[in-house]
């Protein structure tokens, strides 16, 4: 049976399928973890410790060395995405109720959901798109996008926008596993190779644990709203990203569209923030489902829109010839001249 292959046909499947299975478990057998106890309960309720290991391994996978072009491109995209999320947070906090919208079509929508959906880019999706439609430097720009993974940027945005307050030691606690992994991975390439292998492996485990915090009735209530949120993420973050890529990044806007997605890791953010600030606990389940839907929507639409944009600005099929293809073509031309 090709279970893995089938799951990967779904955009973000390795995150979303276990998430849905966890939600099924929580909805129809909410006491399963306590009933079985031991390791089973650990898998069901271990969101935070599993994510802590994942953040450590994510940090270890990042290389310190990068060219100036890569850093400029990735820095431009990351800063722009965070800045847009901050503006959205500042505006939403003055419009939406403190506990989110509780009735009507927009029930479940909260400032936390908006920020979590918008402040992180799906680095893997970006890299795969830009390998086809961008240069080598552009596809390598996801190097700094990994720094967005985790609740730190969301904490910074919520804190600086005056929506929540976090003690300094809480900030340190949120980023410390990532920094320790980052340090070890750059001190020893073998450790980087060893720990980076676990990044993809751990995703289904923390997704299943996250799912066990969600009731399926919440998914039913927020499904269409989540689709609208995903489209909004592409529009609201995509336009500034295109402008920033052209003006500051030296690109043609393709990288900006490719970065206008919701990251799979963002699905975990509402629960993690709620663990630190209990005031967010009432809105965390709905925010989680909204962000999960946004991940699906952006994972499907962003590659399509990026391809259309690239064809418009580059012509042809929109792809960029790779170095080996360019060299081969040049060699063929030299041979014709010699003949």
UniProtKB/Swiss-Prot annotation:
A Gene Ontology cellular-component term: plasma membrane
Induction (record text): Repressed by the HTH-type transcriptional regulator KdgR. Induced by galacturonate and polygalacturonate, but not by external 2-keto-3-deoxygluconate.
Positions of transmembrane segments: 10-30, 42-62, 77-97, 100-120, 141-161, 163-183, 199-219, 224-244, 254-274, 289-309
Protein's UniProt keywords contain Transmembrane: yes
Residue ranges, compositional bias (Basic and acidic residues): 320-339
Localization terms from the record: Cell inner membrane
Membrane topology: Multi-pass membrane protein
Segments for region (Disordered): 315-339
Keywords: Cell inner membrane, Cell membrane, Membrane, Sugar transport, Symport, Transmembrane, Transmembrane helix, Transport
Domain of life: Bacteria
Means of activity regulation: Uptake is inhibited by the protonophore uncouplers carbonyl cyanide m-chlorophenylhydrazone (CCCP) and 2,4-dinitrophenol, and by NaN(3).
Pfam families in alphabetical order: KdgT
Reaction catalyzed: 2-dehydro-3-deoxy-D-gluconate(in) + H(+)(in) = 2-dehydro-3-deoxy-D-gluconate(out) + H(+)(out)
Coiled-coil residue windows: none
Single GO MF annotation: 2-keto-3-deoxygluconate:proton symporter activity
NCBIfam families: kdgT (TIGR00793)
Family, as annotated: Belongs to the KdgT transporter family.
Known role: Catalyzes the proton-dependent uptake of 2-keto-3-deoxygluconate (KDG) into the cell. Can also mediate the uptake of glucuronate with a low affinity, and may mediate the uptake of 5-keto-4-deoxyuronate (DKI) and 2,5-diketo-3-deoxygluconate (DKII), which are intermediates in pectin degradation.
Protein name according to UniProt: 2-keto-3-deoxygluconate permease
Protein species of origin: Dickeya chrysanthemi (Pectobacterium chrysanthemi)
């Amino acid at each position: 049976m090709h279970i893995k292959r089938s799951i990967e046909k779904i955009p973000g499947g390795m995150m979303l399928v276990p998430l849905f299975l966890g939600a099924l478990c929580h909805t129809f057998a909410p006491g399963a973890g306590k009933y079985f106890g031991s390791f089973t309960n650990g898998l069901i309720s271990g969101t935070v410790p599993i994510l802590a290991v994942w953040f450590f391994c994510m940090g270890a996978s990042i290389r310190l060395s990068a060219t100036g072009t890569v850093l400029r491109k990735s820095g431009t995209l990351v800063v722009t995405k965070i800045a847009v999320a901050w503006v959205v947070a500042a505006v939403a906090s003055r419009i939406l109720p403190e506990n989110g919208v509780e009735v009507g079509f927009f029930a479940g929508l909260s400032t936390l959901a908006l920020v979590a959906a918008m402040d992180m880019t799906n680095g893997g999706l970006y890299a795969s798109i830009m390998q086809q439609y961008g240069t080598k430097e552009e596809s390598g720009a996801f190097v700094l996008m990994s720094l967005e993974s985790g609740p730190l940027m969301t904490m910074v945005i919520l804190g600086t926008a005056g929506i929540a307050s976090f003690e300094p030691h809480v900030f340190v606690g949120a980023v410390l596993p990532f920094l320790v992994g980052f340090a070890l991975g750059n001190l020893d390439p073998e450790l980087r190779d060893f720990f980076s292998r676990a990044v993809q492996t751990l995703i289904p485990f923390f997704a299943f644990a996250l799912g066990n915090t969600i009731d399926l009735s919440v998914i039913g209530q927020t499904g269409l709203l989540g689709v609208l949120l995903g489209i909004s993420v592409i529009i609201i973050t995509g336009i500034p990203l295109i402008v920033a890529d052209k003006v500051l990044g030296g690109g043609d806007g393709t990288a900006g569209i490719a970065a206008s997605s919701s990251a799979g890791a963002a699905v975990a953010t509402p629960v993690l923030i709620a663990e630190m600030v209990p005031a967010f606990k009432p809105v965390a389940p709905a925010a989680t489902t909204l962000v999960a839907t946004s991940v699906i929507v952006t994972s499907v639409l962003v590659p399509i829109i990026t391809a259309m944009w690239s064809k418009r600005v580059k012509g042809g099929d929109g792809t960029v010839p790779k170095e080996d293809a360019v060299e081969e073509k040049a060699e063929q031309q030299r041979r014709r001249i010699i003949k």
